[in-house]
């Protein structure tokens, strides 16, 4: 290590002790490859008496450094909270399980009693779960209350390994007279799918003490949702259920509603982007009428819910005095339906809880019953997101142009044959009021249309166009592809234009994202997930000047509350920036 690097590290360490038994190296971007690199970190850990929490997130720890840190952790029996998210950036996947195994073995040797383990944003895959499997099964985790594994790429295999480890932990801890009492489980963006979710549901049912479950964006369909719903019935203390961006359909919606009827402590329900549809929403409305009196936040946005079901939901919250937010945006209420919902809430003095309805779609004429029949006929095909989409393809002769197939785009399925086709969207219409559906409806020429509409020599206009396009980003394949294709067309032309100022573009974009202060007061982007993931795509393209990577890296890696709320997207972008 160079002398100046050691001095910088020492300065960081001087500020690391944050009290309450916590030693923090959070966001220091330390590159700890060898035992020598980790000497100062090890010294600080060694000298910290009564260490209860260790923050290593936002650094990168290699196998040798992990082994060296593990040696000192063997002498820290008071350690309770391990904040070890995002600490393997730039590491090869095979390195991570070895490093985790060393650290885990050290905690076991020390006789530590963990209450919190956070390994989020470490892309270790199924093999990585093997790296801390022994730790989870050991007495060190008998006291575990919070397990955070967001965005780790576990997949189905990793989900099954994790479920088995939790089950064994509960079994062993029960034998010792104090069963595992896990309260918080976080595992979003892991592609657990039905099999992984079902395996975990068995562990949840056994544990029975969960208060928060966060499993968004896992590709779970109605079979997995139903299994989770059954397990939730055994967890009567549940307060937060976040299954955003999975695929319930009516079956999953009804099953989850039945589970909600048995729960009395629920405060937050996030089923946004879950394709609950009207019958699922009606079932949830019924559950609301029967209970859920502590509910504070209900998100059923982008679920293909029609006006009648939305009205039922509005009527069902009348006695929910704690309710602070009801999100029904992006559904199929139509203008009259929106007005009805607003009038109902106004009549019970709850108009203030309703979120924006700006992305609402007109109510289609199709019948949910037809869609539901399709679901019933397709028992063996859990991997299909929307069976009725296949019917639309057949009716249209297999023509894919201007076809809306994503579950993220509300109410695009099951159109009656007599319904007139939706007209294509032009660039100016999209840029005025961006939405995922409009971008898809622009068709295969969307990239050229946007690039032609925007004066790429005007850097600020390119910034605005980038923000507008990236704001509709979704993980769904069709929308994601449309966003990336459009950005490629726009930015390739911009970077090749002599009048375009690349450095100004990056600076202005950082300001708009709230990551760089500006002397002028301006409104920043409220949601950064789409822009961050779109940036992640852009920086990997040949047209992107690699000289700009250092600027982005400097600001994206800095501690920032807004970025911490988008940790998964931030981690993905940082990994690719480090690799440039």
From Swiss-Prot:
GO molecular function: GTPase activator activity; small GTPase binding
Gene Ontology CC: one annotated term: nucleus
Superkingdom of origin organism: Eukaryota
Biological process according to GO: nuclear export; signal transduction
Chief localisation class: cytoplasm
One family name in Pfam for this protein: RanGAP1_C
Coiled coil: none
Repeat region (LRR), residues: 48-71, 111-134, 141-168, 207-230, 235-258, 292-315, 320-343
UniProt record similarity statement: Belongs to the RNA1 family.
Record-given protein name: Ran GTPase-activating protein 1
Record lineage: Eukaryota, Metazoa, Chordata, Craniata, Vertebrata
